[in-house]
C-alpha cells in the first residue's frame, strides 16, 4: 500500500525463520530430518508448540504465520518492507559441516513469505549457508522468482556487497545493504570472496575503516531524496547489552550518510537509539520462528514480538516517527499482544533504551511509539 509522497515509510522486521518446524506446518513441507543433538525431526518442534498453546490445523494456509499482523499492515501505508530472512529456501544441499542447527524451507512454500509482501530480504546471517552453496543459490533464485530482492550474500563478494534499490514513487529510492559480524555466529569460512560464494562478513565493527567501507559501498549510488539503510546481523542471541564497538560502528555509519541501521540476531528486541535524527535498531528480535515450548531465557519474553514502522523525511533523511506493532506468537501464528504484554514491551524497550534518551508511549491504537526524551519534555 503506497504511502504519502512527501515521506518514505519503511516496515522493518527482525529474524524471519520460516524453516524447520514452521516449514512442517505449511502446505509443502520439506524433509523433516535434523542433525540436532536433542531433536532429529522438525515435526518435534510442531509438537512442542502444540503442547504449550494447542493444536495447529495442519496444513495451515500461507497467511497463518503472520496471523493478525497482516490485517494491521494491510491498513498501513508502507513504501518498503525489509526483513532478515534467516532460513534457506531449498530442497537440496548438504547440511553445513559441524553446524547442528540448520534451517530450510521448501521452495514450494515461498507463498508463506510473499504473504508479507517484503521488498528486500537481508541474507547476511548465520543460517543462509546451512545447506551449503547450493542452498544459498536456491534461496537467491527463489527470492528473485518471487520478485523479492536479496542482499548480503551471493555468488561472490561483489554480489554479496551489492545493494538493493527499491523505487518509491517516481524519484526516490530506498537503498539497502546487508552485513554480518562474526559476533552473530557467522564463521569465517562463510565469508564471500572474489571467487567464492558467501556472505558479506565483517570481522571487527570497532575498526573505523570497516564502517567507512560499508557506508561507502551502500552510499555509492545514493542520490538526493534517497534513504540508505544498513541491515546488520550482529551480537548474541540473548541479552540487552550493546557492545561499545557496535554503538561506535552504527554512529560512524550515520556520520557517513547512512539514514537507518536495522539490527538483528537476538531472539528478543534490543535497545533503540535516535542518533543525529536517524534511528538505530540494535536488535529487532524474532518475527517468525518455531521456538514455542523450548525452555530457558523466559525472562526475555521471546514469545513477544515487534514490527517496526519508520517514517522518514527524504529531504533530510531524518526520522519523523517510529512506531512498533506489539505481537505475541501462539501456535506458530502472530496475534495482537494483550494490553498487559504491550505494557511489558513498552516498559522494557524504554528501560533498556534509557541510556540513549528514549521514551516509549502507547498510542490509542495500541501501537507503541518511540519518542526522544527531549522531544517529549518539550511538549509537556
From Swiss-Prot:
Effect of deleting the gene: Disruption mutant shows reduced PLG content in the cell wall, increased sensitivity to chemical and mechanical agents, reduction of biofilm formation and attenuated virulence.
Keyword Repeat listed: no
Domain of life: Bacteria
Entry keyword annotation includes Metal-binding: no
Keywords annotated in UniProt: Stress response
Any one Pfam family match given in the protein's UniProt record, by short name: PGA_cap
Induction of expression: A member of the dormancy regulon. Induced in response to reduced oxygen tension (hypoxia), low levels of nitric oxide (NO), carbon monoxide (CO) and carbon dioxide (CO(2)). Expression peaks in the late log phase of growth.
Entry's family note: Belongs to the CapA family.
Protein's job: Could be involved in the biosynthesis, transport or localization of poly-alpha-L-glutamine (PLG), a cell wall component. Contributes to stress tolerance and virulence.
Full protein name: Probable polyglutamine synthesis accessory protein Rv0574c
